Amino acid sequence: IRTNGEGAYGSDPLWLEREPTRQEVIDAIESANPPSYSEIVFCGYGEPTERLDDLVAIAQYLKAKYPSLPIRVNTNGLSDLIAGEPTAQFFKGVIDTISISLNASTSEAYCEMCRPRFGLKSYEAMLSFTSQVRDFVPEVVMSIVATSDTPETEIAACRDICDRLGVSLRVRTY
């Protein structure tokens, strides 16, 4: 998706020339008239939990000002490894939905596809985070991208993982 254009699925451009400050993010959201949207989503061509403190502070601001506006985070689920500590509890009360990129049914396939900087332990860390965050976020979803070449057995294996974790699976077609 990153190589196909500036944005994805009709979004504004997702590439940034620099990291905006927390206040710049809030100002940009405010200038877009948040009540006119059905949801605020933290996502992009980077990992939003790389700036977990900012993400949580911005979400707290939005929740206080627009309590009925749902907030979602799309994540790779590696925030515990990024932060070096458990992070699921930080989402409590400020995030309504978290979508975690499962991407594959095995750690080997996951690492081949995603090339995480933390290596093979990334897959188990992502599954562990998913299990933990269920206690703090009302809706937890895992996602995979399926093409016409994706075997049904792979989709079924991913669905089994989600069933074991007690979360939903979203299959995105590409």
Where are these regions (language model features)?
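Canonical Radical SAM [4Fe-4S] cluster-binding loop centered on the CxxxCxxC motif
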Residues: I1-T21
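Surface-exposed cleft-lining segments at the edges of enzyme active sites
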Residues: D12-W15, V41-P48, E112-F118
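Conserved AdoMet/S-adenosylmethionine-binding subsite of the radical SAM
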Residues: D27-E30, T49-Y174
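N-terminal pre-triad scaffold of radical SAM enzymes
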Residues: I1-E6, E39-F42, D96
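Short Fe-S-cluster ligation motifs
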Residues: E17-Y45
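A near-ubiquitous, low-amplitude feature marking generic local secondary-structure context
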Residues: A8-D12, S38, Y45, G93, ...
